[in-house]
Amino acid sequence: MFSNIGFPGLILILVAVLILFGPKKLPEIGKALGETLKEFKKSTKELTDEAFQEKEKNK
């Protein structure tokens, strides 16, 4: 999905976010995004581990 976005596209997105939210909100947005990604990775790992355990259990 995002594979076609190059460096100029990322710069454009960052400028748009800066204009929309302002420089004071960026740290809050970054923190929230980081926490969301961390939780997503944790959930994905848990699901993968569960699936692997089920697979091993059914052998």
From Swiss-Prot:
GO cellular component, one term: TAT protein transport complex
Keyword terms, alphabetized: Cell membrane, Membrane, Protein transport, Translocation, Transmembrane, Transmembrane helix, Transport
InterPro entries: TatA/B/E (IPR003369), TatA/E (IPR006312)
Topology relative to the membrane: Single-pass membrane protein
Molecular function GO labels: protein transmembrane transporter activity
UniProt keyword NAD, yes or no: no
GO BP: protein transport by the Tat complex
Superkingdom of origin: Bacteria
Leader sequence segment: none
Record-annotated membrane-spanning stretches: 1-21
Subcellular location(s) of the protein: Cell membrane
Function, in words: Part of the twin-arginine translocation (Tat) system that transports large folded proteins containing a characteristic twin-arginine motif in their signal peptide across membranes. TatA could form the protein-conducting channel of the Tat system.
Family: Belongs to the TatA/E family.
NCBIfam families (alphabetical): PRK14861.1, tatAE
Binding partners and assembly: Forms a complex with TatC.
Protein name: Sec-independent protein translocase protein TatA
